[in-house]
């Protein structure tokens, strides 16, 4: 049974055979659901918590 992986940027599920796999020099594999997530993470170094369209937003500090 193929397993579902999740996007490293937005956290949405990725079906087998879809998305972009990015392998870093140290061997870690980052999977992205779309080119939008890939470019935001790799090219622009954006923080996913600051993007309104990202699903895996974390609540800001409530201290």
UniProtKB/Swiss-Prot annotation:
The cofactors required by this protein are: Zn(2+)
One GO process term, biological-process aspect:
translation
Annotated CDD domains: Ribosomal_L24e_L24
Summarize where Zn(2+) binds, as residue positions: 7, 10, 33, 37
* One Pfam family in the UniProt entry: Ribosomal_L24e
Q: Which domain of life is it from?
A: Archaea
Q: Which UniProt keywords apply?
A: Metal-binding, Ribonucleoprotein, Ribosomal protein, RNA-binding, rRNA-binding, Zinc, Zinc-finger
Query: GO MF annotations for this entry?
Result: rRNA binding; structural constituent of ribosome; zinc ion binding
How is the cofactor bound here?
Binds 1 zinc ion per subunit.
List residue spans of C4-type Zn fingers: 7-37
A single GO CC term for this protein reads:
ribonucleoprotein complex
InterPro entries from the entry?
Answer: L24e/L24_sf, Ribosomal_eL24-rel_arc, Ribosomal_eL24-rel_N, Ribosomal_eL24_CS, TRASH_dom
The family this protein is said to belong to: Belongs to the eukaryotic ribosomal protein eL24 family.
List the HAMAP family: Ribosomal_eL24 (MF_00773)
Per UniProt, subunit arrangement is: Part of the 50S ribosomal subunit. Forms a cluster with proteins L3 and L14.
Q: What does this protein do?
A: Binds to the 23S rRNA.
Protein's UniProt name: Large ribosomal subunit protein eL24
The record's gene field reads rpl24e
């Amino acid at each position: 049974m193929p397993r579902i992986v999740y996007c490293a940027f937005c956290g949405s599920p990725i079906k087998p055979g879809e998305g972009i796999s990015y392998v870093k020099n140290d061997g870690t594999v980052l999977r992205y659901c779309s080119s939008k997530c890939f470019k935001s993470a790799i090219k622009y170094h954006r923080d996913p918590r600051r993007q309104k369209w990202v699903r895996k937003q974390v609540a800001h500090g409530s201290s």
